[in-house]
C-alpha cells in the first residue's frame, strides 16, 4: 500500500483500539518504515500494537486460523454499524444506500488482486466462487478434469457431481509432501493430461499442508494445450503477497474470512473479462448480463453489512503490509517447527523454501494419532489445531497462527507437544 494512503487510512483501521492506541499504532508503523520485513517479523513491540486491534479470547490458543480468522474490531464494528443503518428501513437503506457501495468493495479488491474491477464478483466464500466456475463451465461427457487428491474436498465433490450428472472424467494425481521442487509439482499435474483434458483445477496453496503451487508455470503449460486452469486461492489471498499477473490465470476464487480478516461469509471470484461470457452463473441471470461479472452475484437478498465491511479489512491488511504479514507468518511457523523438528519421530512437512510455504505449518509425529493429539491439546490446554489424514500418504496436525498470535502462545504449543513426544505417548 502507498505510504500516503496508509497514513491517511490507518486511522479508521485503528479507530476501535483503546483511546491512545491510534497514536501508538501510527507511531509504531512510522518507526518501522524502511526496515526489512524479516526484521519487523521479530519486533514484538510492533506486533503488540497490532494485537490491540482484536478482542479475541486469550483463554484459548487459536492455531486454526486457516479455517476462519477473527476480524479486528474495526471490521466487526463496521459490520454492526451497517446492520444498524439497514435496520432503520431495509427496503431503502440496504438497497439504495448500502447496496451501491458494493462497487467500492469491488474496486478495492481489484486493486489488491491487480485486475480490472469488472473482473471481480463478490461471493460468500471460496467454495461458492469456485463452484460458479466448476458448475458453469461448458463440459460434455468424456471431457477430463485433472486435479490432485489434496485439493479441497468440497471442490472435489463438485467435480464428482459433474461426473454423475454430465459424464465428465475426474482424474486426481498424488504428490510428495513436501515436494522436491516446484518443477516436480508441474510435472505431476501435467503427467495426467491427455488430448481429452479440458480443465486443470489446482490450489494456489493447499489447505492440508500449506504447499504453495507453481500456478503460473502450470497455467502456461496448460494454456499451450488449450486447457483451462481453475485456481483455488482460499488460503493464498493476503497470506502472502502476489498479483493476478504473477499467476496469469483466467479463474481464481478465494475466501476473505481467513487471511484478509474480513467478516465471516465473504469471498470473491476473479474471471478474466473475455471469459465471463463462457461461464453460466449458479443462479439465473438475464441474457443482458451474459458478459457482466455481476451475473455471478445474482443470489437474491443478502446482507450488505458483510460485503461492505470488506473495505475495512482490506485497509487493515494494507496498513500492516503484505510483506510484513508473510514474514511474520513464516517467523511464527519456524519458531515452533525448529524447536520440534529434531525430536524423535517428528516430521515437519513444509519446505523451507519461501516460494513453497508461508504461515501454514504441518506437524507429523510417528505413533501419534492426529485426532487424539488435537483432542488432547484442546481438552487439556485449550490449544486448537486441525487433525488431517491423507490415507496412505501422511497424517498429522495443521498449525495456522495469525497476526494477533503471541510468541507465548506459539511457545506454549511447542512446549506441550515436546513434552508429549519425550513422554512417548498421548495420555488417555
Q: Model-derived features: where do they sit?
A:
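Pyridoxal 5′-phosphate
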Residues: 5-428
Amino acid at each position: 500500500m502507498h505510504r500516503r494512503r496508509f497514513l491517511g487510512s490507518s486511522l479508521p483501521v485503528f479507530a476501535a483500539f483503546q483511546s491512545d492506541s491510534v497514536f501508538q499504532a501510527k507511531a509504531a508503523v512510522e518507526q518501522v518504515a524502511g526496515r526489512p520485513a524479516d526484521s519487523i517479523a521479530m519486533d514484538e513491540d510492533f506486533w503488540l500494537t497490532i494485537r490491540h486491534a482484536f478482542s479475541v479470547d486469550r483463554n484459548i490458543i487459536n492455531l486454526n486460523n486457516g479455517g476462519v480468522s477473527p476480524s479486528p474490531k474495526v471490521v466487526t464494528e463496521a459490520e454492526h454499524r451497517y446492520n444498524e443503518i439497514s435496520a432503520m428501513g431495509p427496503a431503502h437503506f440496504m438497497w439504495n444506500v448500502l447496496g451501491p457501495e458494493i462497487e467500492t468493495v469491488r474496486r478495492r479488491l481489484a486493486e489488491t488482486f491487480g485486475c480490472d474491477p469488472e473482473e471481480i464478483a463478490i461471493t460468500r466464500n471460496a467454495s461458492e466462487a469456485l463452484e460458479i466456475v466448476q458448475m458453469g463451465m461448458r463440459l460434455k461427457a468424456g471431457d477430463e478434469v485433472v486435479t490432485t487428491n489434496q485439493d479441497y474436498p468440497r471442490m472435489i465433490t463438485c467435480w464428482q457431481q459433474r461426473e454423475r450428472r454430465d459424464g465428465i472424467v475426474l482424474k486426481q494425481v498424488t504428490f510428495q509432501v513436501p515436494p522436491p521442487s516446484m518443477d516436480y509439482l508441474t510435472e505431476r499435474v501435467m503427467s495426467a493430461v491427455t488430448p481429452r483434458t479440458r480443465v486443470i483445477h489446482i490450489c494456489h496453496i493447499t489447505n492440508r499442508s500449506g504447499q504453495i503451487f507453481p500456478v503460473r508455470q502450470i497455467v502456461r503449460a496448460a494454456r499451450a494445450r488449450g486447457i483451462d486452469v481453475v485456481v483455488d486461492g482460499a488460503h493464498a489471498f493476503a497470506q502472502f503477497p502476489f498479483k493476478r499477473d504473477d499467476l496469469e490465470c483466467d479463474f481464481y476464487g478465494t475466501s476473505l474470512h481467513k487471511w484478509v480478516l474480513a467478516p465471516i461469509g465473504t469471498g470473491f471470484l476473479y474471471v478474466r473479462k473475455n471469459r465471463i461470457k463462457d461461464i453460466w452463473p449458479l443462479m439465473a441471470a438475464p441474457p443482458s448480463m451474459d458478459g457482466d461479472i455481476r451475473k455471478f452475484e445474482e443470489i437474491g437478498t443478502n446482507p450488505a453489512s458483510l460485503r461492505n465491511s470488506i473495505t475495512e479489512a482490506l485497509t487493515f491488511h494494507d496498513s500492516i503490509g503484505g510483506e510484513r504479514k508473510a514474514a511474520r507468518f513464516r517467523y511464527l511457523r519456524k519458531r515452533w517447527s525448529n524447536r520440534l523438528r529434531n525430536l524423535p519421530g517428528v516430521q515437519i512437512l513444509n519446505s523451507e523454501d519461501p516460494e513453497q510455504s508461508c504461515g501454514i505449518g504441518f506437524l507429523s509425529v510417528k505413533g501419534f494419532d492426529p485426532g487424539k493429539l488435537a483432542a488432547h491439546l484442546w481438552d487439556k490446554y485449550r490449544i486448537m489445531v486441525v487433525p488431517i489424514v491423507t490415507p496412505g500418504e501422511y497424517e498429522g496436525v495443521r498449525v495456522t497462527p495469525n497476526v494477533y498470535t503471541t510468541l507465548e502462545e506459539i511457545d506454549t504449543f511447542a512446549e506441550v507437544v515436546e513434552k508429549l513426544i519425550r513422554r512417548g505417548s498421548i495420555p488417555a
